[in-house]
Amino acid sequence: MGKVIGIDLGTTNSCVAVMEGKEPKVIDNAEGERTTPSIIAFANSERLVGQPAKRQAVTNPRNTIYAVKRLIGRNFTDPMVRKDQGLVPYNIVKADNGDAWVEADNNKYSPSQISAFILQKMKETAENYLGEKVTQAVITVPAYFNDAQRQATKDAGKIAGLEVLRIINEPTAAALAYGFEKSSSKTIAVYDLGGGTFDVSILEISDGVFEVKSTNGDTFLGGEDFDTRILNHLIDVFKKDSGIDLSKDPLALQRLKEAAEKAKKELSSTSATDINLPYITADSTGPKHLNIKFTRAELEKLVDDLIEKTIEPCRQALKDAGFKPTDIQEVVLVGGMTRMPKVQEAVKKFFGREPHKGVNPDEVVALGAAIQGGVLNKEVTDILLLDVTPLSLGIETLGGVFTRLIDRNTTIPSKKSQVFSTADDNQHAVTIRVFQGEREMAKDNKLLGQFNLEGIPPAPRGVPQIEVTFDIDANGIVHVSAKDKASGKEQKVTIQASGGLSDSEIEQMVKDAEHNADEDKKRKELIETKNAADSLVYSTEKTLREYGDKLSSEEKGAVEEALASLKSALESEDASLIKEKTNNLTAANMKIGETMYKAQTENQHSEANTVNDEKVVDADFQDVDKK
């Protein structure tokens, strides 16, 4: 087995590392840099990757693609994609399958393809350093990436000619690098604010075991959003001073973006900077120049709400893990944005401790991926990584209820089965609809996919036993199967949503679940109460058909009256009334049971006496004296 490389496929920059002996090492690229800009450009039928692509972006904005990670696995109609359309100079287009793709040099590319070009650069960088062909890799993704996004990332690896041995969460990879070859036991938080995404994970590290307790995040929050705030500020200031709107000028936008990113970085180490962009545009009076003094205080005011948005996921992650901020013994900062003093200040304020700055925030994720590659390659031993799935997974059941099979923050890989049945008599097929989210009703969650299980033998409802199995692999990718236990017929599917789950949808699911918890609970309770009552009505009617002639008219009348009352209650939306009538019918049914049991016992006693009488035999006998 050859070397397994670790790749941090970032929104803004990417990085590749490999195990050298017992230590992970970041590999320099052809330009002598340890990180590579995640930028692709198409110019004169030539494809440029990394720094060369970034250098020509100002003169070729329409054909220069950056931050494509924010589009990967997303549908074109996703609100976040719509938001990005107004911020980037290149075209985002709708693919035939509904996904968001990009257009450059008169060609359409999927985000997986663009990502593959970056991965190829990482692959070549490693091959040049190692002097051998590289075919296997561990690739990192944001912890809050959904199934479609993980699948699309894995596809990117395949396009790049890499066998992706493992998809690993970025905060987990950072924790691996932080805790590698450290013997102490600690509970840590990894705060990862990168170029396009934010993640926070809570982990317990002890004797080589890295156990993720919870994770949370926002897959559309990062340095790109900070840059956009600065860019919009520059546009507003220039428009106020000159009356010219630069937002419709792709060339000016690209220059403004570069200036915004540069100013943001400078303000991490200085209190003020000058933004000078000569000849930014021109009008009838001649060329116009942009010259603005920009302070750290102004920047902090512009992005204060973005920084604050990272705190709620931290709070939720701690809650899910069952910890308080004071339980965290170390806060590890990951991602270039954590160099910003205001971000560090917010982290310190929330966790009540100075964050750990002993790791390189741009390289630590790739180092962790390389360590995981070493584990899979058996170069590294005595390390056990236990990661989690970020959102609950389940299916839609009778009444539209979302029945969870695997809860969020469940350790992966994980496999869970549950037996369901049919809702109608002689039902020969069932549709399994797979959802992801935190709401109690399936329709309020995200449909990941669906499939049919056909050929179920005719039987009364509730009789067939259909076993549904959810299997999440170590990459966080979902596999679902349904099997009719009587016929042995089985249907399996790897869930591949056409457009993936949007970040806004995921966040909204959790927020809505909290805001609408009472409403969801009542609705779920009503449906479950109705389902139970409906089943009781069905079984009671069946009992009356089969044993009604054995009941007295008084007993039968009482049951029929209770049955009619429950049927009437089922027409309403009153859960308490349905429960009351269900209890009444249950009590009436118990009296039937007592009567039937008594009759059956008497019948058995009578039969036993008859059998005993039949066994009595007359016999002659003779006394024999003992001699």
From Swiss-Prot:
One Pfam family this sequence matches: HSP70
Concerning what turns on (or off) its expression, the entry says: By stress conditions e.g. heat shock.
Is Ligase among the key words of this record?
no
| Positions of the UniProt region annotated as Disordered | 602-627
Q: According to the UniProt record, list the residues that bear Phosphothreonine.
A: T197
Query: Is ATP-binding given among the entry's keywords?
Result: yes
UniProt superkingdom = Bacteria
Q: Which residue intervals are annotated with compositional bias (Basic and acidic residues) in the record?
A: 612-627
Q: Which cysteines are joined by disulfide bonds?
A: none
| Keywords in alphabetical order | ATP-binding, Chaperone, Nucleotide-binding, Phosphoprotein, Stress response
Recorded GO MF terms: ATP binding; ATP-dependent protein folding chaperone; unfolded protein binding
Listed Polar residues bias regions = 602-611
The record, for PANTHER family, names:
HEAT SHOCK PROTEIN 70KDA
Family membership, please give it.
Belongs to the heat shock protein 70 family.
Report the protein's function: Acts as a chaperone.
This chain belongs to the protein called Chaperone protein DnaK
